[in-house]
Amino acid sequence: MKVSILSFDLSDNATGRADLLARLLAPRWAVEVVGPRFGARVWRPARDGAVIYRDVAVDAARRYPRFAAMWGDLAARADGDVLLASKPRPTSYGVALLARRRRRRPLLLDIDDWEVGFFRRSGAWGTLGRSLNLGNPNGLPWTWLMERMVARADAVMVASRFLQGRFGGTLVPHVRDTEAWDPARYDRGEARARLGLRDERVVMFLGTPRAHKGVDDLVEAVGVVGSDARLVLVGADPASEAGRRWAAHPWVRLVGEIPFDDVPRYLVAADAVAVPQRATSDTVGQVPAKVFDAMALGRPIVATAVSMLPEILDGCGVLVPPGDVVALATALRRLLGDPDGSAELGRRARERCRERYSFTAARAVLFPLVERAAASR
């Protein structure tokens, strides 16, 4: 049996969830990820991994009406026996609905973000403007329509309790391969040398540093932690406006996007990992996948109390109020000043990850969902 996973833009970081689902399913079924590519190449962290991608270059046809000609090709490439749409977006879930209409197959929908929430960050007037943007295939009007059609899927999976309350479905959080990502397998000294670090105390942020991720708060917080504290931002574009602004601070070091499989080789260098989400419509339903990177690798974590993070890190992480730079700096200073306590916190985080947020835990839920869907054909 073959599973086709549909992603709405293979050049975007949303590819990360599709890549994870493919890795989870691959031991049991043939899997490939299908979708349009609005950028020049497949998203860098996923590009050279084990997952098979069948991307369709959009080029000049990125808006309606020209994009309408792409739908048939995208639906034809989703030729699996089971369809799994990643996100309720038109160019993933919408294409999956069309593919199912052409040839009846089970369709599962995976929701890992509140997509309409992303359009609300600019307030009422910004939302109004976006609601009139009919030319964007994944714009607000069409994404809103997809969320109204969630019930048409044969099964729904969600990545957070907020999303479960809004859309129903089975909870399948982001997870990590805790066997492959065993910190004992990676050389911490080598990782620090790669970053040009010696005895400095290192705080690390890993991910796509968008505004709602709270990186500005983190840069400010680390700046007051102490003269030997360094902040390493992995995944930040040094050439971007924000990247240049952050790099102007002497305590900040930037590393561009890295392959997903290289994450442990960088993250083990950290003395603490920060997940400083802000409280916005972007983050209310979001659980940052990178918190599980840190947990799997036994890193001490400081996070803001947003979405499911208090539940996930209960007893194995430090929580601070979102947007509170003073509280964030205080928590980081405490972790960096207590190596033994930090190590114990990291140990508990890894154990929690193995129990609840590992590949084994996710497959125990995901495999039966796919099997039930396949049996309904």
Show the residue positions of the predicted features:
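Acidic anion/phosphate-binding donor-loop and adjacent secondary structure
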Residues: 176-194, 242-244
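N-terminal subdomain of nucleotide-sugar transferases
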Residues: 1-48, 155, 220-223
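Nucleotide-sugar-dependent
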Residues: 213, 259-266, 271-296, 303-311
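Conserved donor-binding/catalytic core segment of Leloir-type glycosyltransferases
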Residues: 4-6, 197-213, 219-223, 232
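Conserved acidic donor-binding segment of nucleotide-sugar-dependent glycosyltransferases
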Residues: 315-326, 334-340
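A short, well-ordered alpha-helix in the C-terminal region of glycosyltransferases
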Residues: 193, 334, 341-356
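Carbohydrate-associated surface elements
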Residues: 162, 175
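Nucleotide-activated donor-binding/catalytic signature segment of Leloir-type glycosyltransferases, i.e.
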Residues: 241-267
